[in-house]
UniProtKB/Swiss-Prot annotation:
This is Chorismate synthase. Keywords: Amino-acid biosynthesis, Aromatic amino acid biosynthesis, FAD, Flavoprotein, FMN, Lyase, NADP. This reaction introduces a second double bond into the aromatic ring system. Reduced FMN (FMNH(2)). Pathway: Metabolic intermediate biosynthesis; chorismate biosynthesis; chorismate from D-erythrose 4-phosphate and phosphoenolpyruvate: step 7/7. SUPFAM superfamilies: Chorismate synthase, AroC. Its EC number is 4.2.3.5. NADP(+) binds at residue 48. It comes from Haloquadratum walsbyi (strain DSM 16790 / HBSQ001). GO terms for molecular function: chorismate synthase activity; FMN binding. Its cofactor is FMNH2. Residues 361-383 are annotated as: Disordered.
Amino acid sequence: MNGNRFGRMFQVTTYGESHGDAMGVTVSGCPAGLELEEADIQAELDRRKPGQSMITTSRGEPDAVEINSGVQDGYTTGTPIGMVIENKDARSGKYEPYVTAPRPSHGDFTYSAKFGTRNWGGGGRSSARETVNWVAAGAIAQKILTEYGIKAKAHVNQIGDIKAPPVTFEEMLEHTEENEVRCAHPETAERMRERIDEYQTEGDSIGGSIYFEARGVPAGLGAPRFDSLPARLGKAMFSVPATTSVEYGLGHEAREWRGSNRNEDWEFDEDGNPIPEGNTHGGLQGGITTGQPIYGEATWHAPTSIPKEQQTVDWETGEQKDIQVVGRHDPVLPPRAVPVVEAMLNITILDFMLLDGQINPDRLDDNPGQYETEYHPSSPQTN
């Protein structure tokens, strides 16, 4: 099975299955000299882990991370960083009825069609459980980018037909983690929670969307044609299970705008740098960053694991039969996907920062003395 690695310079390679022994990720390309400990990773994993509230799965995973390579005396060494998160609360027995009877709208049939077999416990590799690895890797990327003044943030801006009004970046930083829905507009968050409860009571689920934004990203990142920043970021977001759309700037609303309205005149900022007068393009022009905030929206369909009675077929007996998907599942995805979106945004931006030479890929220039003293007292000075 290919397709388990993301990134060119900052490479994230993952393994693990929903009900296997553990999830794991190897990060190659992290520069030496980054101060890093498990607590840095754990803080982000705790935001994503299950069992946080009544609107998340009740699966009781602590998601405790163990760093087993690439870090010495609290600093990265420049070698691959290995991280393992054990699965502590897997219960595969409830999935036995689906071994030969695919659950509607899951990856059960397609994985079997491709590989001739599949790990049926909890959906195996197709499960969103796998995103725990991405958040672990994203925590490292986030820590590096923070040192360069780059900050990514996301919040849930729509659940079903309930949409939040626009909020500022500062409001996202302040309010997103204040409620279970992770919506930065408190009043809308309450209405969203009520709607989720309504569907959950009916044994159903609901979709939604996440607004994301990154600030401090320099101009000039991206490699057109097929490796532009929006293309790669789109790949990152579409890799998140259940993602149905990704858009930047005006997104689908751009079809209603005349060119004379959407086009933005150029002007100079207070430092004398050329800058568009607006940012309807989401910080991206020609597939390359403009230096303005990158922003957009990603949408998720409703979770497919629901207890409502549905129809399937048993390819072993040749019969059509009723099916009810039992187990512990999320009634809505965006609240737990917020840290996943932030992780993929951070990973993608860091990869381009390394590719374009904005960050030294071998060692962090901001703190070379610490690395020299702690690790290699006889090594040459940083150029």
